[in-house]
Amino acid sequence: RPYLNEAITVVYKLYFRNPLRISDGRAVENPQFADFWSHNIDIPRLKVENATYKGEPYSVVVWKKSVLYPQKTGKLTLEPLSLSLVIDLPSNRRDFFGNRILQQSSRTVTAGRRNINVKTLPEKGKPVNFFGAVGQFNFDALINKNSLKASESFEIKLKVTGNGNLKLFNLPELVLPNTLEVFEPEHSENVKTTLSGMQGNIED
């Protein structure tokens, strides 16, 4: 049971056994992940690997990998992934050399729906000025000058570094005297998303 805005990893795998072979396949229905912020992890090339499922040997292909951040609490549904496959199966016929002739057929397979119960963030110990960050972060305020002359400018950078929902919250606004002329901050992000979630830094 994840918390609101806590990363969830979803991996769709296709299992099959000999003598069945998969010669072609494509997604005919991709999950939309409603109520989640989602990021698909790139799979450069589908490859078949050996695996064990319920004590039996199988071939397996990792078809889709996604990282999700729930944007609502309560019961949320992960939609299924549907694949259209071209399957090769040995027939009872044999070729000139005595090898079994493969027979092709088309099949559609669908992963089942999954429900996830998303918990509300704890209220106990929640800061008054909480701005939505969920994860493990370091927060720094960087000032480029230690002393100032009249009418001289200075720069403050707010920087958050770590692992968590970095792209899903705003940095806190500085409370400054009205006598200072304040310019709009330049926002920058250096964030990568892997199966373990977002990692990197953001700054204003």
What are these regions (language model features)?
Residues 1-204:
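Surface-exposed interaction/ligand-binding surfaces
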